[in-house]
Amino acid sequence: MPDIKAFSPRGMFHEGWTAEVSDYAIACGWALKGKQFIVGDVAGGLFAFEGDTGKIIWKKENTHSGGLLAMTIHPEGEIYATSGQDGKVQICNCHDGKVIKTLDLGKGWVEHLKWSNDGLFLAIASSKKVSVFNEVGEKKWISEDHPSTVSAITWSNKNELATACYGRVTFFDILNNKTNQKLEWQGSLVSMELSPDGDIV
C-alpha cells in the first residue's frame, strides 16, 4: 500500500530514556522549551539532560552547603533558581548552569521557590517569611511573620501570591502590599494547589 506514510505517534506513552543522579532526586523540570531536563538532588547536585536523548549536557555538585531544598524554572525556560539549607538562592543560566545572581536571605533554610506565571517575580519562602524578588534579583516585597513556618507558596494570578502555613491560607496583593483574603483551617497544611483560574484551593 504505497499511500501509507510513517508518522510519529502522539497521545500515548512511549519508552524514552532513564538517567541517574548522585543522590535522591528532590526537584526537576523542563527548560529551553523541552530541549533540556534539569534534576536536582538532596546533596546539592544539579544535572542537565538533553530532552530527547537523556545525554548529560552539564552538571554541578554541592551547589548549596548542607543540601538542596527547592528548584524552580522560569516560565521562559532560560533561567532557573535553586535554594538550600545555606539560606541562599541562586539564579542561574539553563544553557550552562552558571550562576547569574546569588540572593542571601540569612541563616534560615530556604524551602520553597516559585516564579510567577508571567516570569516577572520570584517568590521565596524561608521560615515564617515570604519574599518576592524580580527576575534580576531586586527585592520587591516581604511578608510579615506567618504564625508558623510557611509550608507552600503559589501564584493565584499576576500579582497575587498564596501562602500556606499552620491554620491558614493567605492571599497577598504584592504590588499594593495588602492582604486580599485569609482562609482559616484548624490543622497543619503541608501542601497547597490552586485551580487554573485561582478560585479554588
Describe the residue ranges of each PLM region:
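WD40/WD-repeat beta-propeller blade N-cap
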Residues: T18-A25, E61-L68, D104-V110, E144-V150, ...
